[in-house]
Regions:
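Extracellular, disulfide-bonded carbohydrate-recognition/adhesion ectodomains
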Residues: 1-160
Length: 160
């Protein structure tokens, strides 16, 4: 798996989102959501832009996922592996450099913990061929021909 930067307007699968969690008792997620580490995740296979994906997450009471630790990253890698039919299937995550080029922030404003990032070899590259402003959104997926258990994060915002 890797992280890749892409144009925010490109169509990709909606990212996992973090919604309702019962803090005072055992975690009980709504039907269709997966629980891990006290958080609930919804995996949508709708292909949409980063903004459309975020809107879908927020309508369900969550947001695009913020990866806080290695355990969460491994959980996401494992769950997403079962959702992807081919290497182009990637999921938007809540990481962007839209506020300041090259400074990667989660949607809550916290900076990317670089010890948790696994950029693809060529990323972030701020590719400007499709959009002169470059790329500002991040997607999580698997590189073509890579081992299924290998993980890396990529900044992505292209359409498919």
């Amino acid at each position: 798996f890797f992280i890749e930067v892409k144009s925010c307007s490109n169509k990709h699968l909606t990212c996992p989102e973090i919604p309702k969690v019962n803090i005072n008792g055992p975690c009980a997620c709504d039907e269709g959501w997966d629980e891990h580490g006290g958080k609930c995740y919804y995996f949508s296979t709708n292909k949409s832009s980063w903004t459309e994906s975020r809107d879908e997450c927020r309508a369900k009471g969550g947001d695009l996922v913020k990866i806080d630790n290695w355990c969460e990253q491994i959980f996401l890698r494992t769950r997403l592996n079962g959702k992807m039919e081919n290497f182009e299937d990637m999921f938007w995550i809540g990481l962007t450099d839209a506020v300041e080029e090259g400074r990667w922030l989660w949607l809550d404003g916290s900076p990317l913990n670089t010890s948790l990032s696994f950029w693809a070899d060529h990323e972030p590259d701020n590719w400007t061929h499709e959009n002169p402003d470059g790329e500002h959104c991040v997607r999580l997926g698997e590189e073509e021909g890579e081992e299924p258990l290998k993980t890396c994060l990529t900044d992505g915002s292209t359409k498919h």
